[in-house]
Amino acid sequence: MSAPDLKRAAAERAIPLVEDGMRLGIGTGSTAAAFIKLLGERVRAGLKVTGVPTSEATRIACEREGIPLATLEDLPELDLTIDGADEVDGSLRLIKGGGAALLREKIVAVASRRMVVIADASKHVETLGAFPLPVEVNLFGIGATTRAVEAAVARAGCTGETVRRHDASGAPLLTDGGHAILDLRLGRIPDPEALSAGLWAVPGVVEHGLFLGIADAAILAAAEGDAAVVSVLGRL
């Protein structure tokens, strides 16, 4: 069973959570893209929802599927957000931001009554940190900000390197908000809460990819032979 099949299986399990009339946060990334396609089918069959996208890429995908959209200015409180994750541990702590949408993803998730993660089971880890942790930073003073971020990482008991992210063309990547991303290649994060607090204390840090105390459940799809087996962390 391929990775796209597993992502679709996780997305399929999330679709019944979407009820008529819901205000829905819609995530970014390949698993969220599978969810958007399935949601579009439901909308064309008569389901009435209003979505708030977490990136320009998600907005375009939703418009292609005919999903009605709004902003958090229109709908400041959402019923549910469905989004992917780069890593999730047993306490539902996440690393997100591989798709460079972490700022909008966190704003939308926190504006929601519930957040449910969809992912293939390879994203379930014992300790966060194997996936690089994205830190979104202002372009002004980026050299000083990078040094301060590295000092915060050391104080939190982590080691590794800090790399500015580039896009597919090789140019420094800019987020939808016009910020840079520093990827922290740490290997493991022994105390995510301490690292989160340390990063927040750095002027110039706009957001980071640790989502702590935000997700309510995670739907994880694993391959078992030719079939997908779906499990749930937390409560749907």
Swiss-Prot record:
Which Pfam families does the protein's record reference?
Answer: Rib_5-P_isom_A
Which cysteine-cysteine pairs are annotated as disulfide bonds in the entry? Answer: none
> What SMART domains does the annotation carry?
DeoRC
According to its UniProt entry, one GO biological process term is: pentose-phosphate shunt, non-oxidative branch
Catalytic reaction annotation:
aldehydo-D-ribose 5-phosphate = D-ribulose 5-phosphate
Per UniProt, the keywords (alphabetical) are: Isomerase
Function text = Catalyzes the reversible conversion of ribose-5-phosphate to ribulose 5-phosphate.
Give the similarity note: Belongs to the ribose 5-phosphate isomerase family.
PANTHER family tied to this protein: RIBOSE-5-PHOSPHATE ISOMERASE 3, CHLOROPLASTIC-RELATED
Q: This chain belongs to which protein, by name?
A: Ribose-5-phosphate isomerase A
Q: Which organism is it from?
A: Methylorubrum extorquens (strain PA1)
Gene that codes for this?
rpiA
